[in-house]
Amino acid sequence: MTQRDPSALTPEEIQKEALPGESWEAAARRIARKRAEAGKSGTPPKPQNPTSAKAAPIIRLPFWPESQRGAPNEIVRSALFNARNRKQKRGYLANVDVYVIGDGSITYTGEELRQDDETVWLHLIHLARNTPPGELVEFGPHAFCKAVGWDASGKSYQRLRDCITRLQATALGVYSKRLKEGLSLSMIPFFRWKNAEGHALKTYQVRIAPEMVEFFGEVHYTQFEWEQRLALPSGLASWLHGYFASHREPFPVKLETIREGAGLTMERLDHLREKVAAALEALRTVGFLVSWRVEKDLVYVVRA
């Protein structure tokens, strides 16, 4: 049997042994060096803090594969990023209660957020997952637009800046039984895309709120397939993708609950029924659902 190289590190090992404020790369080098030295001396490496290994605080966002994205459960079960058409006029919300399906409550101040804003936010969180909370995350607009399924054009760059600016000018309050106390934060506290002369930079910079780590927690977040989301129409289908992904075995849900959770404004149930059916069929087409049905205004789905 081939033995694993003791200096080869998994992301989970790096996260467990990293020191507060230590960059991902620095932690990997330090841990690998310590293991290599221990291997030469024949002495097994000691944990950084053996007395508190289980109680060590989470200092980074969770790690997930490149093919996936992650979001706190309360976000994907709420109307924070609603499913309305992104081209419709957006309202400004001042300390408004956001509808949440299940436990928890959210208050929000800022310009109305849609599913395209969530797509951008999800990829920003993805890029930040290897970076200590509060440190700058850098990326090029060309690569970012490609990663979220947009064409790399000046129009897309402007759309990207608009989305991040909306996320920056926010005040989000989250209250849940699992949190020791409520969280209040800006979703993107810092965003730089132009220099002092007003010219666009080749590399954009953002900073994710450190409190976001606590919001994710150890297990209270949803991972879902990124390519599936990008293949879906942006709107109700992408919202339902996140919502149903947050349940291993989704239970039946009322049409009215979907309407409120997705932040839709249509009142006629027949119109809502048609819209939900089209979105569910899109989820089946991309391979997320095996089957679905709407019976007596209850939605039943079976995940793949």
Task: Identify the function of each model-found stretch.
Residues 1-304:
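Charged, alpha-helix-forming regions
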